[in-house]
């Protein structure tokens, strides 16, 4: 595909860059995950990427992780339609995510299940530690799960805006003694980047996960470390840069901030991630990574 035109070429270039990252001996690959990717059916792909160490760190919205836990506990999202009477859906207790449906009462079961788990936790934790605790306490029915794959593979997950999700709602319902310190997230993720010889980033969408990874280079520089910016970069987005939003921000703009290396191998794929991600994952099947980082210090 890299020898075709338009976004087909960009998708092919993304595959080539990802493949090159996997062949590097001393690199940490960080993925930012935003948008409703789990309801859209991308959950098993992300879990597979984690288990096979095609990525080493995940920064995600809390919503994707909540929906992942929802399915891990045996519930499902359903194929629906955007051409419906939403007032009728509300009366029937059905939540709509574009053309995907889910039952509100099932979401509520997960809300209260998480609230019960959180009530048993205490202390000050990063979101990574918090999510590891939850994953270790869940009695799951489906292990094709992002949080379970990460827990079992020792791949750290950060969710710096976790309060902005149903996991945050569950925490608000809990009789909680646990405190989630998101500044500790900043410190932990920056430490991972600083201790990596090279870093590569893959962004599905943008938002908080993207900037949280991007800013590690700035934090490291302010702390006195000699960093060069991320050296590989892939973004899959449907947004454009003209309106100033981060989700459409180009990697060229990131170079001006020192977040992306001026010599980085980079590509932006303007495509629906539910199209691009399965194609990329299919291409990666035959590639086996020989060496990946182990985060003993976390």
UniProtKB/Swiss-Prot annotation:
Task: Please name the top-level EC class of this enzyme.
Answer: transferase
Recite the UniProt keywords alphabetically: Hypusine biosynthesis, NAD, Transferase
What EC identifiers does the entry list? 2.5.1.46
Q: Which reaction does it catalyse?
A: [eIF5A protein]-L-lysine + spermidine = [eIF5A protein]-deoxyhypusine + propane-1,3-diamine
Q: According to its UniProt record, which residues of this chain constitute the active site?
A: 259 (nucleophile)
So which cofactors does this thing need? NAD(+)
Q: Name one GO cellular component term.
A: cytoplasm
Molecular function as annotated in GO: deoxyhypusine synthase activity
What are the disulphide bonds in this sequence? none
The job of this chain, per UniProt, is described as: Catalyzes the NAD-dependent oxidative cleavage of spermidine and the subsequent transfer of the butylamine moiety of spermidine to the epsilon-amino group of a specific lysine residue of the eIF-5A precursor protein to form the intermediate deoxyhypusine residue.
* NCBIfam families, per the entry: dhys, PRK00805.1
By sequence similarity, the record places it as follows: Belongs to the deoxyhypusine synthase family.
HAMAP family reported in the protein's UniProt record: DHS
- Could you tell me what this protein is called? Probable deoxyhypusine synthase 2
Q: Which organism is it from?
A: Archaeoglobus fulgidus (strain ATCC 49558 / DSM 4304 / JCM 9628 / NBRC 100126 / VC-16)
